A protein has these predicted regions:
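Helix-rich catalytic cores of soluble enzyme domains
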Residues: 2-189
Length: 189
């Protein structure tokens, strides 16, 4: 309800007193009834992704869902260069119904990706484009958002080093590549 916030995300608060098998339903219902902001749906299991899309159809109707993106899923690749069953199933559910998917390669340079900024950016774009191509097999023209979470790590301690200049440079580079590819961009950090 704040004018400064444009999106509700998905897990605003994890209701740990609700069984895991039903938790996503309560979180979705809360977003749908207590907020006027767009939000993400569940992606952790195919059935939860399906529940998210089905609940969105109850709210918006089948015709609106056929012609509009009313809910999106946010998935991560398993760097380096791996897309697991959970991600592929979520992509099939959302994109198969014409709904959007945000793909965010999560890469800590030096751990799950190359040390250099340019090589990490190349890996992130390759992983995201792999999922983009797969999403279009589910439904040609399905909405796709290029995501990015590139950070660095201390090669001395192995600890993530948030706030370093390399991730900012990566965001700029991926932003330019997203613009060239004609894709909307979501960056973390």
């Amino acid at each position: 309800l704040s004018p400064a916030l444009h999106h509700g995300g998905f897990v605003t608060c994890e209701p740990c007193d609700v069984p895991v098998s039903k938790r996503h339903l309560d979180m979705l219902l809360t977003h749908m009834t207590l907020s006027d902001k767009p939000h993400l749906g569940a992606i952790t299991e195919m059935s939860r992704a399906q529940d998210s899309v089905d609940m969105a159809e109850i709210i918006f109707g089948q015709d609106a869902m056929e012609n509009n993106c009313v809910i999106m899923g946010n998935v991560n690749t398993n760097s380096p260069l791996l897309v697991d069953k959970v991600v592929t199933q979520a992509v099939r559910v959302y994109c198969g119904r014409g709904q959007g998917i945000v793909v965010v390669p999560f890469i800590l340079s030096g751990a799950m990706g190359p040390v250099s900024t340019a090589a990490s950016v190349a890996q992130a774009v390759a992983e995201a484009m792999m999922v983009c191509a797969y999403s279009q097999l589910g439904r040609n023209g399905a909405p796709f958002v290029l995501g990015n979470f590139l950070s660095s790590m201390s090669l001395k301690s192995g600890a993530p080093t948030f706030g370093m200049p390399e991730p900012v440079i990566s965001n700029y580079a991926i932003g330019q590549l997203a613009r060239r590819l004609g894709l909307p961009l979501r960056c973390a950090g």
